[in-house]
Amino acid sequence: MSTESKCPFNHAAGGGTTNRDWWPKQLNLKILHQHSSLSDPMGEDFDYAKEFKSLDFEAVKQDLRDVMTRSQDWWPADFGHYGPLFIRMAWHSAGTYRTGDGRGGAGAGQQRFAPLNSWPDNVSLDKARRLIWPVKQKYGRKISWADLIVLTGNVALESMGFKTFGFSGGRPDVWEPEEDVYWGSETTWLGGEERYGAQKKMQQPGDGTLVAEPENHANEESRTASGERNLENPLAAVQMGLIYVNPEGPEGVPDPVASARDIRETFGRMAMNDEETVALIAGGHAFGKTHGAGPADNVGPEPEAAGLEQQGFGWSNKFGTGKGGDTITSGLEVTWTSTPTQWSNEYLENLFAFDWELTKSPAGAHQWTPKNGAGAGKIPDAHDPSKRHAPSMLTSDLALRFDPAYEQISRRFLANPEQLADAFARAWFKLTHRDMGPLARYLGPETPTEELLWQDPIPDVTHPLVDDQDVAALKGKILDSGLSVSQLVSTAWAAASTFRGSDKRGGANGGRLRLAPQKDWAVNQPAQLANVLSTLESIQSEFNAAQSNGKKVSIADLIVLAGSAGVEQAAKNAGQQVTVPFTAGRADASQEQTDVESFSFLEPIADGFRNYQKGRYKVSAESLLVDKAQLLTLTAPEMTVLLGGLRVLNINVGQSKHGVFTDKPETLTNDFFKNLLDMAVEWKATSGANDTFEARDRKTGEVKWTGSRVDLVFGSHAQLRAISEVYGSADAQERFVKDFVAVWTKVMNLDRFDLA
C-alpha cells in the first residue's frame, strides 16, 4: 500500500462540499466583509496618502523610463521598448470600470488577482507587472501597485513622445480579490451567451473585403447585426474575459459596422462618448502591436491554473521560443504604424489610405490587410530588423472608418492631429482616473488644475463654518419647522445613500439632491422632497442673512444636520438622549457642475433601506439590498441595525407599511427585530411572486404586520437572523440606538474625503 493511500487526510481546511454547492441561491453576505485588517499586511495604522506624499515622484518616473528600453531576455521588448505593453497594462487595469455600478477600474490594483489576472484579454500582462516589480520593490509602501500600474502607462506615453494631461495618485491597494463584482454568468472564457440571452447569433458575411468609399456602407444595415444586441446590465464587455469588445468583430464575425455598435455600447458604459472613444482607440493604437505568431493551442494555462513553478506566470508558450517574435497573446498579428514606439497620426493615415481586405493571422484570427499588396514593407518587424511588413488592422479598427459617426470624428482627427492629441490626453486621463472619486482624493505634483465635469466638482468652502452653538440653534429651528422625523431622516438618507464605494461617486456633499436629476427620481418622492427642501432653504437663508462675519451653512450640510436632528428626536421619543456627530464643511454644487446623464447612473433600481424597487428583476430584492449595502461599504451587522432603525423611523417610499413592525413610528426602538422574531405570528406570502407577505396572529388569525422580501430575510437567513437576535433581545435597546447612530453617521460622511 502506498504512503499516499494510507494517509487519513483527504482534504485541507476549507475544502469539501460547501454551503454554496448545496444551496447555490443562498444570499451571499461575504461581499460585505472584504478587505478587512485580517487580509491587509500593512496594518490598521497605515496611511497610504501620507506615504505617497513622501515619495520622490520624479525619481520613480526616471526609474520607469529606464525600464522602458532595458529589454529582458526572459521577455524581450517589442521594437526595443516596453511602452506599448505598459500602456495596455494600464488601459486594461482601468478599462474594467463600468458606470452601471461603478465597479471595476484601476483604483484597487485588482489586475494582480483572479479573475482579472487570468482573463484571456490580459494575456502577457503578468509579464508587464513583473517587469516593473523592481520599481515597486525599491519604493515599497510609498507607492501602491494600483498607482504604479497607471503611472507606468503615463510614463510609457511620455517616453514615446506624447504629452499627457496629468497623473494623480491616491489608489490604495487591497490584498484579496473583489468578490462583489459581477463579471457575467458564463462558465467558459470568451462566452457571451448569457449576457445577450437567447438573442440571434451573428452570421458570417458573404464577402470579406471593405472598399475605400465609405458612402457604400454609411446607410447599410450590417448583415451581421440585424436586430439589436442587448447587453446585460451592468456589464460593459461583450464576452467573459474581455475588457470591451472582440477585436475580430461581434462573436468573432469580422463586420466593422457591427463592431462599431459593440464599441459604442461598451465604451459608453465606461462613460466615454464617441469622440473620447475614437481618441482612445486611435491614440492607443498609435503604439505597439498585437501578437498571434502561431496557433493558440500552443498556449498553456492562465496564471491561476498554472503550476507552482511558474511563480504567478501563465500562458506558457511552446511555439518556437515562446517569446519575442514567437509571442501569442490575442492571436491577432497586427502592427498599425511604422513608428510603433513614437507618437504620430499614422494610425489614422493608414486607416484611410488603403482599401482593406480580410485575411487571417498565423493563429487563424480574422484581421485586415491592404488590398493588392499595398503598403508592403512599410512596417518594421518587432524583433528582426531584416523583416518588413504591410500595415494591418483589426475589425474594431475599421469600425472607426465605416461607422458614420466614428468616421466623421476620425477624419477630423486625421486633418487636425493636434485635436487628436488633446482629445486622447483628456480621454486617457479620464479612463485612468474615472473611479477615483472627488478631487480631495487626488495626490501628487501632476494633478491637473482644470475642473472637469466628470469629476463631479464641488466648490471649495471659503467661508467660516457653523460652530456647536450654531448647530444646536439650527437643529432647534429644524425641529420647530413642522417637518416630521420621517421627512427629515428620509431626505438625509436620499442625499447620502447615493454614495458608491466602488467609484467614490455620490453622497450628500455637493447638495445635489436639490438638482436634476436627483430631485426628480421617484425613489426620492419629488413632491415631499420639494417641500422639505423649501423649508430647509428658508432656514438656511435666514441663518446666513443673520451672520456678520461671513459664516454660512450650506444646504448640503443642512440636509445632513436635519437628518441628525430627526434621529436624535426619534431616540428621545424612545426615552434615550443621544447626540449624532456632525461635522460641517460640505459645499453646494451648481446645476452647471452636475452632468445629468452621468448622475442618472446613481439612481437606485432598488433601495431596500426604503423598501423600494423600481421594477421587477431577476435578481431577488434581498440580493439587491446586499448589493446596495456593499456599495455603501456596510458590514452585515451595520446593514442589519441600519435597516431595522430606518423601518421604525417610517421612511419607506410612499409611506408603505411593509416592515414597519411597530405601533410607535418615528420612535427609535428595536421593535422591528422584536416583532420580526415574534413566534406568536405566522408569515405567509400574499403575492404569486412571493415578494409581499403578511404576519397573522397564530391564535386569532388577525393580520399584525406586512413585509417585503427585504424585511423577511432578516428572520429567514441564518446569519442575518443571528444578528437580528442580538438587536431583538430584551437588553438590546441601548446597544441598538448606539449602533444605529454610529452607522448612520458613517453613511452621512462616506463622501467626506476632506476629513481623512
Curated annotation (Swiss-Prot):
Cofactor binding comment, as recorded: Binds 1 heme b (iron(II)-protoporphyrin IX) group per dimer.
Domain of life assignment: Bacteria
Metal-binding keyword on record: yes
Keywords (A to Z) from UniProt: Heme, Hydrogen peroxide, Iron, Metal-binding, Oxidoreductase, Peroxidase
BP terms from Gene Ontology: cellular response to hydrogen peroxide; hydrogen peroxide catabolic process
Pfam families registered for this protein in UniProt: peroxidase
E.C. code: 1.11.1.21
Compositionally biased residues, Basic and acidic residues: 214-223
Cross-link Tryptophyl-tyrosyl-methioninium (Trp-Tyr) (with M-270): residue positions: W91-Y244
Catalytic reaction list: H2O2 + AH2 = A + 2 H2O; 2 H2O2 = O2 + 2 H2O
Cross-link (Tryptophyl-tyrosyl-methioninium (Tyr-Met) (with W-91)): Y244-M270
Site (Transition state stabilizer): R88
Positions annotated as active site in the UniProt record: H92
Region of interest called Disordered, as start-end residue ranges on this chain: 198-230, 371-390
Keyword Cytoplasm among UniProt keywords: no
HAMAP family the record matches: Catal_peroxid
Function text: Bifunctional enzyme with both catalase and broad-spectrum peroxidase activity.
Family: Belongs to the peroxidase family. Peroxidase/catalase subfamily.
Protein name: Catalase-peroxidase
